[in-house]
Amino acid sequence: MMITLRFVSSTDLMARIIRGAELGFAYQHVEAKMPDGTLLGAHLDGGVQARAADYDTAYVADLYVSVPCSADQEAAFETFLRAQVGKPYDVVAIAEMADGVVTGEAPSWPDSPSWICSALITAGLLTAEIIKAAPATVRLATPRDVLVACSALTIIGEPKQNPGVSTIRS
């Protein structure tokens, strides 16, 4: 069995803030490709949602990563993510990243009332026991942290450039 994660590079303000927190890492967003083809993730606009696969036309590059797991882990990952749909975006976490001020991890992160994209995916991977430990505090995990955690489980491929966008801007 596999779960598929989509890492995305964009040029908007939020992407630039996250890129700074990630020390220039190429991807500023991560979401899960669900079995029905939707992309489930957390965005500033709309919080946690399952969006149509073609919703994102302004990306610069994306990278799909297939992560091996058992059928039970795949089901637990999907169940956890779907239970988060409707929760708002964690704007405070992004502000803390931008300011370099971290208030710490809430001990009840599985029940978080809001999510950033990478914290959502990290929590799903942990809940499903696909990864055994968070690569950073769950609440402030970045897409880079998620990719590093997954790189121990699978071969990471090449990104696909969006032909409609020419470059990644800082």
Stretches found by the model and what they are:
Residues A71-G100:
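A structural motif
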Residues Y27, F77, C117-L120:
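Generic hydrophobic secondary-structure packing signal
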